Amino acid sequence: MLKADLRRQMLARRRALTHDELAQRSLALREQLFRHFEVARWHWLHVFLPVARQHEPDTWLIIHQIWRECPTVQVAVPVVQPDGVRLRHCHLTPDTPLVENQWQIPEPVSALEVAPATFDAVLLPLLAFDELGHRVGYGKGFYDRFLLECRPDVLRIGLSLEPPVTQIDDAWAGDVALHACITSEQVWQF
């Protein structure tokens, strides 16, 4: 399938999820992450904050478990820059105040900026992924550009509410592939 078709199809599927279904899948994603990855060994994790109107996975479940059980792991979140093209990355603590930006993405008001080369792992938002590790996001390229700024050994993990499609037909060389993708049913390794 083509990315544009996958975006439409997966957004429709996501919006059809009930609150309870989304909550159950989000819990399962958290359980899979902590079961299959040594989260406590990471120093810095970059994670997206969920946009409620998009029915994104509730990454707060992951963040709160890290704060409770992995006190040495620091969390950073993206902040969309005014140019609408780039991200910067800010340290998130339990006391960090957040506001929603123009796209209703929660972002830190004022927080320590963290360089992309700092991260050991990145949890990536996506609408779809394929069996080769390619992902389909919202189409702005934020994460492809960001991942190129990270260390080559950064672990790239997608969080998906749906299983993979066989192949994304218009994946291209500039797409940064995943190392793994977590679904509520299993972890896909690439």
Describe the predicted segments one by one:
Residues 6, 29, 142-143, 177:
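Internal, well-ordered alpha-helical segments in soluble enzyme and binding-protein domains
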Residues 1-114:
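N-terminal active-site beta-alpha-beta segment that forms phosphate/nucleotide-binding
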Residues 49, 79, 91, 107, ...:
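Short, structured patches in soluble enzyme cores that scaffold and shape functional sites
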Residues 91-94, 137, 141, 172:
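Short, surface-exposed, charged loop/turn segments at secondary-structure junctions
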Residues 50-53, 127-131:
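Short glycine-rich anion-binding loops that position phosphate/pyrophosphate groups of nucleotides
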Residues 57-64, 133-147:
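Short Gly/Thr/Asp-enriched flexible loops that form oxyanion-binding sites at enzyme active sites
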Residues 10, 47, 75, 123, ...:
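A residue-level signal for conserved active-site and pocket-lining positions in enzyme catalytic cores
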Residues 1, 12-15, 112, 117-122, ...:
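Surface-exposed, charge/polar-rich loops and edge strands
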